[in-house]
Amino acid sequence: MGIESFIKDKRKTKDILVMGHVVCGYPSFEENFSALEIMEDAGVDLVELQFPFSEPSADGPLFVKANEMSIKSGTTVNMCFEFMSKVTKRFSFKVLMMGYYNTIFQLGEEAFLSRLKDSGGEGYIIPDLPVEEATKLHTLSRDLDLDPIILMTQTSSDDRLKKLGESSSGMVYAVARKGVTGSKTTMDESIDSLISRCRANTSVPLGVGFGISSKSDLDFLKGKADVAIIGTAALQAWETSHAIGYKNFFESLQIS
């Protein structure tokens, strides 16, 4: 079952789905696995496994640090794929690769997609790859039933959103505000407007991310978006209180 069908099926019984995020190898793969166990117990539906990169341009300070520390500890792309394989065999949530195009470029597009497929991934999120430069990659992806997740932003023109919508597959990642990940996003009419504009340009499910951090944020998105994407707030909870803080954070969202 692809991402689109998976989300639509789960939405029959859930007002909104939740997608979590870990940076592979930070603080360690063992702690990643513990975090994923907590997420599954809390009812998380999808998870991004971020392959660390030295210049994560879409990420805020906390994730930049996580990427840097993971690389310094010796994390490799091969280790990330091996971890993904372990994760997809163990957990029921769907797994997406998140990263930057340099990772794909270094492997080669066909080799990257083959490894992703073999590791049980459902698709990928590459925020620094414009759709105009991704035609071949997206075609190869769909031949393997892998979904390239497209990002839509508030600053995109209607013509741009239409073009992005035509390239969308699996789900769309609606970026809730300008800038990088990490800062709190105010849930207001600007988010409603973004969601409406995205909906007008794609028929695939819609996820909203960047600054989603609380149950009230999830409640705001219910009936509007299909997936709430949570990254920095969860990692901050781990940084502050490790597994206990992480568990308390996800329990506070009351996902299930």
Where are these regions (language model features)?
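Glycine/Thr-rich beta-alpha phosphate-binding loop at enzyme active sites
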Residues: K65, S73, L151, L161-A200, ...
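C-terminal helical cap(s) of enzyme catalytic domains, especially alpha/beta-barrels
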Residues: D59-N67, L235-S256
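N-terminal amphipathic alpha-helix/helix-capping segment at the start of soluble metabolic enzymes
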Residues: M1-H21, S85-T88
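Glycine-rich phosphate-binding active-site loops on the catalytic face of alpha/beta enzymes
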Residues: V44-E55, G123-I125, L129-E133, V172-G182, ...
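Active-site beta->alpha loop and helix N-cap motifs at the rims of alpha/beta catalytic domains
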Residues: L46, F51-F53, V64-L129
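Short beta-strand/loop segments at the ligand-binding rim of alpha/beta enzyme cores
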Residues: T13-M19, R90-Y100, S141-L151, R199-F210
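Catalytic cores of alpha/beta
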Residues: F29-D41, S156-S167, V208, I212-A228
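Catalytic beta/alpha-barrel core
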Residues: K72-T75, G120-E133, D147-S156, K162
